[in-house]
């Protein structure tokens, strides 16, 4: 069975896989560049009045939640990332196009952060968005993809 015949037999794969791998690869490459550029030695780079590049190790999940959870949380979040990604893949034939796109973004981001947890025991964050003195918690490409994917998923359900 060739790849093209597999794609034809599994509806949505031709959209899911490119988006999934684009998110995953962009996330991992950006994190490696940031590890080399701003993590060792730690330094801060101002990009403009709204954006900085900063070195942040996140041992929890979004916004640093569950950061003190230790090994159990790390394992749980990693298992959850693979479970959610597997669910999206399994559900592909039943999903609408926008949901496939959203699922691919969420899965790619989830696996990107899971790879960090497996490699480092924590996640590499480096994007610091701020308005004046108010700073959004540092995030990465995977987090952005998960957030965009969740927004697209919600939109697909509501409209």
Cite the ranges covered by each PLM segment.
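Alpha-helical transmembrane bundles and membrane-interface segments of multipass inner-membrane proteins
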Residues: 1-159
């Amino acid at each position: 069975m060739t790849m093209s015949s597999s794609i034809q037999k599994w509806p949505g794969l031709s959209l899911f896989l490119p988006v999934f791998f684009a998110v995953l690869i962009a996330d991992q490459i950006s994190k490696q560049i940031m590890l080399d550029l701003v993590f060792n030695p730690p330094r801060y780079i101002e990009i403009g009045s709204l954006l900085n590049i900063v070195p942040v190790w996140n041992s929890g999940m979004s916004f640093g939640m569950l950061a003190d959870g230790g090994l159990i949380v790390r394992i749980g979040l990693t298992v959850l990332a693979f479970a959610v990604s597997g669910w999206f893949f399994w559900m592909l034939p039943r999903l609408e196009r926008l949901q496939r796109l959203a699922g691919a973004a969420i899965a790619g981001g989830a696996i990107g952060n899971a790879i960090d947890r497996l490699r480092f025991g924590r996640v590499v964050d480096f994007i610091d968005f701020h308005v004046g003195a108010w700073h959004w918690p540092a995030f990465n490409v995977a987090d952005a993809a998960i957030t965009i994917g969740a927004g697209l998923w919600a939109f697909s359900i509501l409209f």
